[in-house]
Curated annotation (Swiss-Prot):
Gene name per UniProt: Mlx
UniProt protein name: Max-like protein X
Tissue: Expressed in all tissues examined: stomach, duodenum, jejunum, ileum, colon, liver, pancreas, salivary gland, kidney, spleen, lung, heart, skeletal muscle, brain, ovary and testis.
Bias (Basic residues) ranges: 28-37
Top-level lineage group: Eukaryota
Subunit note: Efficient DNA binding requires dimerization with another bHLH protein. Binds DNA as a heterodimer with MAD1, MAD4, MNT, WBSCR14 and MLXIP. Can also bind DNA as a homodimer.
């Protein structure tokens, strides 16, 4: 503390002012270095009157702090209270600016970081969900294929039969498919064969229906005229026709049969039946006998 009547020329006053000026200059330069890379940090230029001490304040009296310093040195008198207050306020302001700039630069932007973290977590969770969904779909596909091969082995009979070349080993997928293809081809052939048989049977049914209709008409005609034709052919004529047919057949039978053994007789009988009892041969024999009887009667 200085006395109210102390002169600015006092060495103690000069030393105190020089120390304050030096401290203020060091603090300003430190703040300038710390705030050089920060946006909005307060900086003091070398021409600032606060860095130049009392001389700077005398040259630039427009600064508020310089007004108090100039008043303290006016009229060759020094007001220690005003000087200490000015120095204290300057140091407090510089310290507050330094703390504010440091805190402003050190406090992180929590909203942006939270949003970035949430986006990264959402991306990771989305990738995990897609990976799990893909894994589940792939597992379902493999299970469906496995069930299909198991069903084929159960349905196809050739897959159930044991192949001795393979042994007791499990059938591979290629073998199951090949056996299935072979079985399907076999089913197609059987289907075609059965369709042909069905077509033949349908034709036979149609022919039988026509014959049935014809026989029904013959029966109906005979029922309408039951006595028609009874007196036209006598029993003697019928016997003569039968006798003529049998004589012709016996002639060929007697010429073809050998009775040396039972085996030869059996062979000759079957050979004679196949040769002389055909429909066309019998037809010719009957026509010839009828012509002979006609000539005899008329």
């Amino acid at each position: 503390m200085t006395e109210p009547g102390a002169s600015p020329e006092d060495p103690w006053v000069k030393a105190s002012f020089a120390d304050a000026h030096a401290g203020e200059g060091r603090a300003g330069r430190a703040r300038a270095r710390r705030g050089s890379g920060r946006r909005g940090a307060p900086q003091l230029s070398p021409e600032s009157p606060l860095l130049s001490g009392a001389r700077g304040c005398r040259e630039d009296s427009s600064h508020p702090a310089c007004a108090k310093v100039e008043y303290a040195y006016s009229d060759n008198s020094l007001d220690p209270g005003l000087f200490v207050e000015s120095t204290h306020k300057g140091s407090v302001v510089s310290r507050a600016n330094s703390i504010g700039s440091t805190s402003a630069s050190s406090v992180p932007n929590t909203d942006d970081e939270d949003s970035d973290y949430q986006q990264e977590a959402y991306k990771e969770s989305y990738k995990d969900r897609r990976r799990r969904a893909h894994t589940q779909a792939e597992q379902k596909r493999r299970d469906a294929i496995k069930r299909g091969y198991d069903d084929l082995q159960t349905i196809v009979p050739t897959c159930q039969q044991q192949d001795f070349s393979i042994g007791s080993q499990k059938l591979s997928k290629a073998i199951v498919l090949q056996k299935t293809i072979d079985y399907i081809q076999f089913l197609h052939k059987e289907k075609k064969k059965q369709e042909e048989e069905v077509s033949t049977l349908r034709k036979d049914v149609t022919a039988l229906k026509i014959m049935k209709v014809n026989y029904e008409q013959i029966v109906k005609a005979h029922q309408d005229n039951p006595h028609e034709g009874e007196d036209q052919v006598s029993d003697q004529v019928k016997f003569n026709v039968f006798q003529g047919i049998m004589d012709s057949l016996f002639q060929s039978f007697n010429a073809s049969i050998s009775v040396a053994s039972f085996q030869e007789l059996s062979a000759c009988v079957f050979s004679w039946i196949e040769e002389h009892c055909e429909p066309q041969t019998l037809r010719e024999i009957v026509i010839g006998v009828l012509h002979q009887l006609k000539n005899q009667l008329y």
